[in-house]
Swiss-Prot record:
GO terms for cellular component: cytosol; plasma membrane. Homodimer. The lineage of its organism: Bacteria, Bacillati, Actinomycetota, Actinomycetes, Mycobacteriales. Catalyzes the condensation of isopentenyl diphosphate (IPP) with allylic pyrophosphates generating different type of terpenoids. It comes from the Bacteria. InterPro entries: UPP_synth-like, UPP_synth-like_CS, UPP_synth-like_sf. This is Isoprenyl transferase 2. PANTHER family: DEHYDRODOLICHYL DIPHOSPHATE SYNTHASE 2 (PTHR10291:SF0), DEHYDRODOLICHYL DIPHOSPHATE SYNTHASE FAMILY MEMBER (PTHR10291). It holds the Pfam family Prenyltransf. SUPFAM superfamilies: Undecaprenyl diphosphate synthase (SSF64005). Substrate binds at residues 25-29, 37, 41, 69-71, 73, 75, 192, 198-200. Its cofactor is Mg(2+). GO terms for molecular function: ditrans,polycis-undecaprenyl-diphosphate synthase [(2E,6E)-farnesyl-diphosphate specific] activity; magnesium ion binding; manganese ion binding; Z-farnesyl diphosphate synthase activity.
Length: 245
């Protein structure tokens, strides 16, 4: 990001604390231009960094980016291989820059099937940035919302079976502590470019009362101004959380 960002003037109390971002449309963007699908993913790297800068400019403390889902293993072997290497290399290339900006990187997702080299880079980024406080970037790699809930339920069942957790102790708050990143707040703004209107199994528990904003623009074409527009729309929403005002 080289140009000066001019975020909208929105009072802090009307800003989302946590944005969930589905980085959708990379493959279609490339196909529309007669390029390999991998070229769309490469372009998406720069766009994600722009989104981090935009969040910092607005004072939004949490951004969760859907980088690779548990369902993405169904893609072609070549594309999966590329995405594994690409996620590894993005972290390797960008962790120092993210650290310099005060960004704390967190990994959300499952270990099974994930390349060891990807895990090493995720853990290295977490360790390098663990004390940063400007904002938190959750890289959701090998992540699925249902898988996360199932994993949490299994751990609760295991503890109940050995007598360390009583049924009456299982509440929404205590259940949250068994999720992949329990210290992050619930999602306020669920953002999906590309024109598609679905959650795609992303942060299901955390997005129970998220405001959904769908924008008809493929992710490689997405700009900070598009993110600003989504936040402005969010700020105008009347969030009642099931109640009335």
């Amino acid at each position: 990001m080289t140009k000066q960002l001019v975020p909208p003037q929105i009072p802090q109390e009307f800003l989302p604390r946590h944005i969930a971002l589905v980085m959708d449309g990379n493959g279609r963007w490339a196909t529309n231009r007669g390029l390999k699908r991998t070229e769309g993913h490469k372009r998406g790297e720069a766009v994600l960094l722009d989104m981090v800068d935009a969040c910092i400019a607005m004072g939004i403390p949490y951004l969760s980016a859907y980088a690779f889902s548990t369902e993405n293993w169904r893609r072609s072997t070549d594309e999966v291989r590329f995405l594994m290497g690409f996620n590894r290399d993005v972290l390797r290339r960008q962790r120092d820059a993210l650290n310099a900006k005060g960004v704390r990187v967190r990994w959300v997702g499952r270990r099974p099937r994930l390349w060891r080299s990807v895990i090493r880079e995720l853990e290295a980024a977490e360790e390098l940035t663990k004390d940063n406080t400007t904002m938190t970037l959750a890289m959701c790699v090998n992540y699925g919302g249902r898988a996360e809930i199932v994993d949490a339920a299994r751990e609760i069942a295991r503890r109940s079976a050995v007598g360390t957790l009583r049924p009456e102790e299982i509440t929404e708050d205590s259940f949250t502590q068994f999720l992949d990143e329990p210290d992050m707040p619930d999602v306020d703004l669920f953002l999906r470019p590309s024109g598609e209107k679905r959650t795609s199994n992303f942060l299901l528990w955390q997005s129970a009362y998220a405001e959904m904003v769908y924008q008809n623009k493929l992710f490689p074409d997405y700009t900070p101004e598009d993110l600003f527009a989504a936040v402005e729309e969010y700020a105008l929403r009347d969030r009642r959380f099931g109640g009335t005002k």
